[in-house]
Structures are given as structure tokens and as C-alpha cells.
Design a protein with these regions (language model features):
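Intrinsically disordered, low-complexity, charged/polar segments
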Residues: 46-73
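Short beta-strand-centered aromatic/proline hotspots
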Residues: 21-38
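General beta-strand recognition
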Residues: 10, 44-46
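Intrinsically disordered, low-complexity repeat segments enriched in small/polar residues
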Residues: 6-7, 11, 34-37, 65
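Short, exposed beta-strand/loop patches in secreted or surface proteins that constitute
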Residues: 1, 35-38, 61, 68-70
Length: 73
């Protein structure tokens, strides 16, 4: 399976960088989210947050490999 826009991922342990307090309660380990953008070079994904308008890469909340696992392609 490979990740793409629309895939469902489950968040795991978050990396060493602190997450913005506005998003910390929403993006907790074990929660599932829909991928908006995926960078095949870095494995970076972007997710949306309620009230956050995401229309292009760079607008979303970023997570890196090891911080998420693919649930549904």
C-alpha cells in the first residue's frame, strides 16, 4: 500500500518537535485523519485541522514518517 491524498493514517508517537498547542489536543496518538498532501521524497504528510483552510501544500499540519501509520490507502 502507498500513501496518497485521501489516505487514512493513524498518528503514533509524535516526533521531538513540539506541536502547536492549538493542535495538540486534536492530533493525539491513536487518532485517525485523512491525508491532504503527501511528499513521496520525504514521506511528509499534511493534515487539516477544523477551521484551518488548506488549499495547497504547506498550509496543513505536517507529520513525518514514524509519526503516523497508513490505515487505508
Amino acid at each position: 500500500m502507498s500513501i496518497k491524498s485521501g489516505s487514512i493514517v493513524e498518528l503514533m508517537d509524535l516526533g521531538p518537535e513540539p506541536i502547536d498547542p492549538r493542535y495538540a489536543a486534536y492530533f493525539t496518538p491513536g487518532t485517525r485523519h485523512t491525508v491532504l498532501f503527501f511528499d513521496p521524497v520525504t514521506g511528509e504528510i499534511e493534515l487539516s485541522y477544523p477551521g484551518l483552510v488548506v488549499s495547497r501544500p504547506g498550509d496543513g499540519v505536517t507529520f513525518f514518517p514514524g509519526e503516523y501509520k497508513l490505515i487505508v490507502e
